[in-house]
């Protein structure tokens, strides 16, 4: 879509509104589906679809650089979350969050890095997701798409909600599963620590406003 933007701009500008509409619908619908999932990996999978909706909507608003920026930051914190989920599943031998809980004490590295990924995905500063998601919201505001702007903001709150729910069911409270979970080997936790750095710092590349510019749709 980003590569085809010049074509849409010159030949079919009305198609950009359709692209933006489908992106906004996707980010909201996938986020709502993630709220009701009990499988940890499914939560992250639908979350990925929701974030792709943000990227598609950004392209529709003309902010294709912001979309690619979000693709860049999202790659790091979502990889961190999926690897963290893998570490948890390896420990408890189940994907269901209903059979987890209380893992914060026995899996401190996994817990800490999962929190970093969660905060980055929720878009809180100074984590990576804040910078890229903020550019997308700014593009809606710049284009005067106030309805889409508030839907995207609602999507951000939904993201924070389902990830807070996932953290609570997985790491807090009492352990509801079977066996004796333990922290994963360093071969699994070292990549988590490395990705945590990028989940925090990958958004800082936009401090010089590399991805911030007037919308290419201004001259349509």
Stretches found by the model and what they are:
Residues 1-192, 196-204:
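Hydrophobic transmembrane alpha-helices and their helix-loop junctions in integral membrane proteins
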Residues 211-216:
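Conserved small/polar residues in nucleotide/adenosyl-binding loops
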Residues 219-220:
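N-terminal low-complexity segments that are often proline-rich with Ser/Thr-Pro
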């Amino acid at each position: 879509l980003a590569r085809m933007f010049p074509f849409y701009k010159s030949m079919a500008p009305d198609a950009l509104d359709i692209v933006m509409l489908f992106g906004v619908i996707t980010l909201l619908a996938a986020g709502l589906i993630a709220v009701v999932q009990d499988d940890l990996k499914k939560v992250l999978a639908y979350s990925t679809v929701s974030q792709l909706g943000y990227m598609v909507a950004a392209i529709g608003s003309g902010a294709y650089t912001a979309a690619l920026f979000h693709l860049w930051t999202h790659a790091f914190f979502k990889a961190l979350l999926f690897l963290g989920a893998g570490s948890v599943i390896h420990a408890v031998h189940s994907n269901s969050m209903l059979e987890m809980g209380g893992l914060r004490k026995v899996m401190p590295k996994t817990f800490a890095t999962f929190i970093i990924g969660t905060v980055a995905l929720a878009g809180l500063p100074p984590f990576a997701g804040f910078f890229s998601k903020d550019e997308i919201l700014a593009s809606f505001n710049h284009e005067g798409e106030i309805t889409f702007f508030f839907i995207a903001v609602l999507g951000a709150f939904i993201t924070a909600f389902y990830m807070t729910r996932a953290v609570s069911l997985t790491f807090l409270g009492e352990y509801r599963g079977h066996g004796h979970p333990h922290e994963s080997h360093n071969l699994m936790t070292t990549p988590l620590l490395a990705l945590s750095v990028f989940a925090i710092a990958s958004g800082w590349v936009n401090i010089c406003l590399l991805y911030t510019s007037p919308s290419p749709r201004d001259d349509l």
